[in-house]
């Protein structure tokens, strides 16, 4: 049996909390993506009132586990897993809120983009640095980012690999709210409960 890298808590207020728990950087390994897809499909089959996805106190998700990219075939396989998992998150028939503390980079940013709303802490930063590895975002990020911030800003972020901090993310429409790190989870839960 594989290690549980994602925990789900269904609260009495109708909110389901999905917690990423894959080590220090919350990398989205192939096993995390499989578990995320399974969790999202379960939340679609038996939906709660709303969903909050959280990482750790210091990092939302660092993106793909690049140690798994041993060649083009593995990269394609992981790309498919990303697309399947993030599409499953986007398909949850309730409001899904990403509570973003610290970096949400690469696939971590794409996970936040697959959510309906993004509440972030003042220390959050978003970015699609895949171009620096010679690849482009493969989990739906090119489309979802453009829908949120417009095609021109999306091209800037995707083609440069530039990262944006919380205040800029709020200004350009990538984040919906910015709160202190201490308030992040409680604010995301409060917002989710208002939809539940």
What spans do the regions from the language model cover?
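Glycine- (often His-adjacent) and acidic-residue-rich active-site loop
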Residues: 32-35, 55-88, 104, 132-134
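Glycine-rich beta-to-alpha active-site loop
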Residues: 87-133, 137, 163
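C-terminal long alpha-helix characteristic of the crotonase
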Residues: 119-124, 166, 175-196
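Hydrophobic/aromatic residues within transmembrane alpha-helices
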Residues: 18, 53, 65, 111-113, ...
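Conserved CoA-thioester-binding segment of acyl-CoA-metabolizing enzymes
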Residues: 1-54, 87
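Short, structured loop/turn "capping" segments at alpha-beta junctions
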Residues: 151-155, 164-171
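Hydrophobic, secondary-structure "cap" segments at the distal end of domains
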Residues: 143-152
């Amino acid at each position: 049996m594989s290690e549980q890298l994602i925990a789900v808590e269904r609260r009495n207020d109708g909110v389901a909390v999905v917690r990423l728990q894959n080590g220090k950087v919350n990398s989205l390994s192939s096993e995390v993506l499989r578990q995320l897809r399974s969790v999202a499909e379960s939340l679609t089959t038996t939906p709660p009132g709303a969903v909050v996805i959280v990482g750790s106190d210091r990092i939302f998700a660092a993106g793909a586990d690049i140690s798994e990219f041993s060649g083009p075939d593995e990269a394609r396989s992981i790309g498919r897993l990303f697309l399947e998992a993030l599409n499953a998150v986007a398909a949850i028939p309730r409001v899904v809120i990403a509570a973003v503390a610290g970096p949400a980079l690469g696939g971590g940013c794409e996970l936040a983009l697959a959510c309906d709303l993004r509440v972030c802490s003042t220390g959050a930063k978003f970015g699609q640095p895949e171009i620096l590895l010679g690849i482009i975002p493969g989990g739906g990020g090119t489309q979802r980012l453009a829908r949120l911030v417009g095609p021109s800003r999306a091209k800037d972020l995707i083609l440069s690999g530039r990262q944006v901090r919380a205040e800029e993310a709020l200004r350009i429409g990538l984040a919906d709210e910015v709160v202190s790190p201490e308030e992040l989870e409680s604010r995301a839960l409060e917002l989710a409960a208002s939809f539940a």
